Amino acid sequence: MKQNFDDRKIVKQYREIARQIVKKEGLYKNMDQDELREQTNYWREKFKTKEMSERDKINIFALAREAASRIIGLDAVVVQLIGALVLGDGKVAEMKTGEGKTLMSLFVMFIEVMRGNRVHLVTANEYLARRDREEIGQVLEYLGISVALNESDLDKDQKKAIYTADVIYGTASEFGFDYLRDNMVRQKEDKVQSGLDFVLIDEADSILIDEARTPLLISDRKEEDLSLYQTANKLVKTMLKDEYEIEEHKRFVWLNDAGIEKAQKFWGVESLYSAEGQAELRITMLLMRAHFLMHKDKDYVVLDDEVLIIDPHTGRALPGRRFNDGLHQAIEAKEEVEVKEESRTLATITIQNYFRMYKKISGMTGTAKTEEEEFRQIYNMDVVVIPTNLRINREDVPDDIFYTKKEKGRAIVYEVSWRYEKGQPTLIGTSSIKSNEWISGLLDAAGIPHQVLNAKNHAQEAEIIAKAGKRGMVTLATNMAGRGTDIKLDPDVHKLGGLAVIGTERHESRRIDLQLMGRSGRRGDPGFSKFMISLEDDLLEQFESKSWEKLSVKLKRKAPRDGKPVNSSKIHAVVVNAQKRLEGANYDIRKDLLSYDEVIDLQRKMVYKERDLLLERNKLGVSSEKILREVAEYAFIHPVDIEQEKLEKYYARQKELLGGTKFPVSFDEVSLMEPAEVVEKIVTWHKKERDKFPIETITAIEKEVYLNLMDQMWVMHLDAMVQLREGIHLRAYGQQDPLVMYQKEGAQLFEKFQADYHFYFAHALLELDPDGLVQG
């Protein structure tokens, strides 16, 4: 891939600095460990009061380079140092697989610690976090830097201990969940995460882009009539194609007029779009999504009567993860397995909004340039392509395009068989378990031994990948094929052409295609890559158009029956265009998710800030008297000439809502007093009751009650926002923008949430009892 002018300029600038670092290798050669640690302490102290110069940076890099050479026997080369300098600028460094990103990370982490920042190193999974912590962590520890591993099974005290380290390794979800859990604690001392200074993200495209479609959620069980899912399943199984509309690439399906009429008759409601029919509409739409948009062995897999999500970008099953907002239950009903309770959201944040809270963020990956616009727009990060240390020696040939999947399958078997006969290892990449198993059947029929890797046997991943570079080995894998791990070639494989990679479908992102190709030709090894695709592949079917249908029919009519690939510039253009459109659609989904989450994000920050102040001060930020006065003023504003009968009902309602059994104002008093006098009497009575408590006791009670009510109301508010989000598109008519409607109604719901917990707090204040603390 060509680098743009800015890339070349940056790389040229940093190449000179990197060469100066290498020239400094004699500077620390004769120092023992204690002397090197003294250097570490010197730099740490210096930058507490002074800015870091370029000369300082060169010396610090040289110090880390010497330590790596001693401890793990690796001397960082110029391109790795260039990459580290790019990371230090808060950019994404695209470095080809096998070029040494792990060693590159050492330098930016070390220099950020010298600047006084606590560093979080984020990896794609716990295995990689543990591996990299062991390898690079020992170098940092040799220099006196504390290093820890953030794992999911740690208790609160262990978490607090690891967050005191200078460098902490872990997964994106674990850091994110720690943040959410910290904002659910009842005491300040129970928080574990201590500041978000600098984060370095490995496999940045996977974490910041691919995982961005799934928000982080902490939830519990939500009571619901689960039988509705089975009932709706009966309806949707009878749906005909002329009863609904579908845009699969946008992941959207809806009922047309015929479908609405059928559903209303089935449910026995006059209108699905009335308040009466909202529950039935929601459950019907969920089952339609499950049947028409979610595909078994592609989006999910059923193992031991359990529905498991398949990560679309890694091909891995995700045990413990569930589709939210009822979709998982809908799929369970579709597959006729046990429908489990839907979860209720207690706390949530998107990957985008979590990482944007860090003061500084950098990323490294083998494939990022194709997503540069998204990195720049969402994260304000440029992508810089780092040159390889050795020339890439892989042969990448144009796609072979076949008319049918059947012809493609025969051609793949032929391609694999002759490479197998000569002993060349071959990696066959598929986009789903379904196609993975189809190709496996073809290879079995041809008598070609092979190993299979997909979400159903992911536990053997390391073992399978370890064998993939052996002479004569054929490996069939979904796109989970070992990100973060090398396929090492047997010595005699080089002369056979290295590892051959055969892609059986173009993926929904060019980036994933490049990742598959990047399995071969690492560190100057020879290699080969080719995609063998057909006009019947899912990518093209998702973007059917009248013009494409006409072209497809015309091409198939003229197709030679010899099974050879067609070399048509028109077809190549259609494939490229379909992939770009799908990339654009997925980007729109992620932008859409972020736009909607930004509404909640603003609200979340306000609530979490108020919680933090409450925990910090250990008392209310405003007096309970002020809150009670505001609520009482709101409750007792009524017309002076109100009719007697209405006043009695009004009084009874307000008494029950505001004060319950201990309401301090009688009906007779209310009927004779001005609203302001009623309010004053309520506040005065509360003050007298409050003064009966020791100050420490009443302060603690008020804080606990307020916090408890705020948390309860926040959970209810999140649920209300989910319901609003689910239904907003169904209610968006004419020129009304669903996002604008969501922002407006979301703001109204937030105002109601704030009013509600203040109202219930005022109620609790009037129920205070010096003997029983808070009644009820």
From Swiss-Prot:
| One cellular component term from this protein's GO annotations in UniProt | plasma membrane
Main location as per UniProt: membrane
Keywords assigned by UniProt, alphabetized? ATP-binding, Cell membrane, Cytoplasm, Membrane, Nucleotide-binding, Protein transport, Translocase, Translocation, Transport
According to its UniProt record, the EC number is 7.4.2.8
Q: How does it sit in the membrane?
A: Peripheral membrane protein
A GO MF annotation of the entry reads:
protein-exporting ATPase activity
Broad class of enzyme this protein falls into = translocase
The free-text function statement in the UniProt record for this protein reads: Part of the Sec protein translocase complex. Interacts with the SecYEG preprotein conducting channel. Has a central role in coupling the hydrolysis of ATP to the transfer of proteins into and across the cell membrane, serving as an ATP-driven molecular motor driving the stepwise translocation of polypeptide chains across the membrane.
Q: Which family does it belong to?
A: Belongs to the SecA family.
Q: Output this protein's name.
A: Protein translocase subunit SecA 2
Naturally occurring in which organism (per UniProt): Listeria welshimeri serovar 6b (strain ATCC 35897 / DSM 20650 / CCUG 15529 / CIP 8149 / NCTC 11857 / SLCC 5334 / V8)
